[in-house]
From Swiss-Prot:
Unconventional myosin that functions as actin-based motor protein with ATPase activity. Plays a role in endosomal protein trafficking, and especially in the transfer of cargo proteins from early to recycling endosomes. Required for normal planar cell polarity in ciliated tracheal cells, for normal rotational polarity of cilia, and for coordinated, unidirectional ciliary movement in the trachea. Required for normal, polarized cilia organization in brain ependymal epithelial cells. Binds a calmodulin chain via each of the two IQ domains. IQ domain 1 mediates interaction with calmodulin both in the presence and in the absence of Ca(2+). IQ domain 2 mediates interaction with calmodulin in the presence of Ca(2+). The TH1 domain is required for activity in complementing zebrafish defects in Kupffer's vesicle lumen size. The modification N-acetylalanine is found at residue 2. Interacts (via the two IQ motifs) with calmodulin. Binds an additional calmodulin chain via a third, C-terminal region. Interacts with F-actin. The gene is MYO1D. Signal peptide: none annotated. It is found in: Cytoplasm; Perikaryon; Cell projection, Dendrite; Early endosome. ATP binds at residues 102-109. The modification Phosphoserine is found at residue 200. This is Unconventional myosin-Id.
Amino acid sequence: MAEQESLEFGKADFVLMDTVSMPEFMANLRLRFEKGRIYTFIGEVVVSVNPYKALNIYGRDTIEQYKGRELYERPPHLFAIADAAYKAMKRRSKDTCIVISGESGAGKTEASKYIMQYIAAITNPSQRAEVERVKNMLLKSNCVLEAFGNAKTNRNDNSSRFGKYMDINFDFKGDPIGGHINNYLLEKSRVIVQQPGERSFHSFYQLLQGGSEQMLRSLHLQKSLSSYNYIHVGAQLKSSINDAAEFKVVADAMKVIGFKPEETQTVYKILAAILHLGNLKFMVDGDTPLIENGKVVSIIAELLSTKTDMVEKALLYRTVATGRDIIDKQHTEQEASYGRDAFAKAIYERLFCWIVTRINDIIEVKNYDTTIHGKNTVIGVLDIYGFEIFDNNSFEQFCINYCNEKLQQLFIQLVLKQEQEEYQREGIPWKHIDYFNNQIIVDLVEQQHKGIIAILDDACMNVGKVTDEMFLEALNSKLGKHGHFSSRKLCASDKILEFDRDFRIRHYAGDVVYSVIGFIDKNKDTLFQDFKRLLYNSSNPVLKNMWPEGKLSITEVTKRPLTAATLFKNSMIALVDNLASKEPYYVRCIKPNDKKSPQIFDDERCRHQVEYLGLLENVRVRRAGFAFRQTYEKFLHRYKMISEFTWPNHDLPSDKEAVKKLIEHCGFQDDVAYGKTKIFIRTPRTLFTLEELRAQMLIRIVLFLQKVWRGTLARMRYKRTKAALTIIRYYRHYKVKSYIQEVARRFHGVKTMKDHGKHVKWPTPPKVLRRFEEALQAIFNRWRASQLIKSLPASDLPQVRAKVAAMEMLKGQRADLGLQRAWEGNYLASKPDTPQTSGTFVPVANELKRKDKYMNVLFSCHVRKVNRFSKVEDRAIFVTDRHLYKMDPTKQYKVMKTIPLYNLTGLSVSNGKDQLVVFHTKDNKDLIVCLFSKQPTHESRIGELVGVLVNHFKSEKRHLQVNVTNPVQCSLHGKKCTVSVETRLNQPEPDFTKNRSGFILSVPGN
């Protein structure tokens, strides 16, 4: 039941009518048409009235409103039925089909396009490129087929002159992966002749109006439509179709689908050749047939890539083989014209079939493996010509109306007859509803040996000249007593029928008078073999492939081909069988008037269509019947999770009992009936509620399964990780053990080696032991060092420690650290170094020891110092374990300044061989000096000074910062300055000079 619409628009579902009667049905249909509501439901059938105007109800917003919704949730629409078919296909993996029926001009083709548009819009949410390509090609194929298969008729500006059934293939996710198109009975006679007020196929007009000047010149065409005999009837007609614009649309669509440029060019050449064929005129000179305008033959030969003489011969002669003899039989003027027209019709029909085949080659599913990709399901869309009643109804209308009888029979079988039969078979209480079964009309046309088609085939196979009048006579004799057949001979008082020309069939849609003129010829569908050989021998490979039977030898005897009517009958039977195997959804199209007006609702015209479409009977069956039925097993399989009594498995005696328990649990027992093998649900709402409950439970089931599966995965991962960690642990243990064993092997006996293993190369450790290797090497180096110093006297150990400290601080930063000599330390007390003054210095040192109570002398030396006033003087420094003294040697080593060592923050030295050193203090009163020695001259003592001070600070667990830079940064009473070192060749001894940034220490060059 449809919802979401106000009652001012009438009943959205005819099932909701207060009384089921034709007046109420028509009143509701008219009201909805006048209010712009062109769609109405009959349960799951959509009734569509052609609005004859554009409506803004097919956009993206509307698509989103219907996507995934149930039928009753939204107002009636084509999108609702399309979504229902799509959901049924996706949910139940069931092939579905949408059958669009109605008479010519009722809007079937437009409906099929909107359905395709909707399916394309709601699929492929992941935007897979291949799926998008397939969707695009399926949509584009519509406009190509319309161009070559549709035409303007008196009833419809875009009338389908062929039948089309398209299968859209979907993968297991519901995305389109391909398709296949079947075409039925192209009205090829329209190529050569049209009724007044009608046109030939759109393709001819599009080429002439839309082709460029250059293209038309290459095809020897001109834009004037009246210049071509085959289309001049419709040349003067005013049409709402923009042929020039459509030409570009079709050309672009062919390119998108995958037609190669040479294939598209061949299509245009064939169209041009047909137009030129129509302009050929024949005459007879004596007994010789001639072509009046021979130049046109050359143009046709050029366009068909054949030789001019071969084209001319095929048009004027017919090759006849009698035994081994081959005879060229001349045509009469009439026979030549007939052959020309048959040739034009055949070329166009082959072209159309080739276009369909080419599209199928491109869009068909390839390399689809159900074991890998899952089940391949199908939605079929049938857009076939509607019921036709013209002023002059010929063979084509006979076939078209037979097709509609077959489709009506299918509707009756599936919707009316089978439905009622199933209720009786399942034991469901049911009141029979009468309906007209058109099986008798179908049998009248197609019955073996007795039907009209069988009689027509017999007439075509008779030896000798058989006329259409003879065929009508056969119909009269064999079908004279049939209640749905009549002719003037059978009903002499019926003056509507013409003697020896007309017969009438009482179709389900109304009485139709057919003219037998042309029935025999059109059924034989004769085309001389000469034309087939002509095109098979074309140098154009596309044309050649269209005519494979042309390769047969002239003398080869072939089986009589099936007639056009029999071929069509067989294709209709196959189509109906195909549709019957799928779950059908119906769109019943109604034409509101014959004037193509958006304002007129012709009650009589519409009532007639409602009657013959059986819509009122459809409403009665729907109101009395059930919306859904399913076997107990399948129903249980789908919905068992919504009841605790059936999930995960039931323990009841049968599936039927389990289904009853499930329905009672949900509270739907008043809306169902239980058959012998199936459950029947009356209203769609109950089914949709079941679907909602199922969807809710599926979320919980999925979450439960996810939880269990994630737990399983976590346990599996834990076990794998634990096993991996065990392997890693054992492997690391193995690598560590191997490494330790290798170290032990290599360093075995190092105690007895002269260098205590210095030359032994360490093995490469595993990554995990790299830091351990560093620690191990440190331990080894300490051990080796301990072995080396064992032989040294205890008095030398402080000097060794100082040298080590100097190396740690200065190695790689200064060249000469004085490591090779013995470090004297207290050079001021050394007689070799200061023989004249050592005697003076020693008493001063002793007095300072008594006064300041220092324990050890760390370093003493003569220096040259510079102060903040840029005054350079010779001084001496005396460093003990407590103080740093600056002394004046000229005044018997008088102490000029005392700096406690705890006030010392660091040392700065240069990176050269000079003896510059800056003592940094906490009060920013740095001491800048240059060490110098007297014996030997220029001895480097920087390394010694740094080593003893660093070693002393380390022993007191303090850190002394040592900087190696050039220039050296310092601070004199808070003023920042720099001391840079320069080497000068003529400099006799180190000396300080002032510059802008501080001082320069000039030292002698080498």
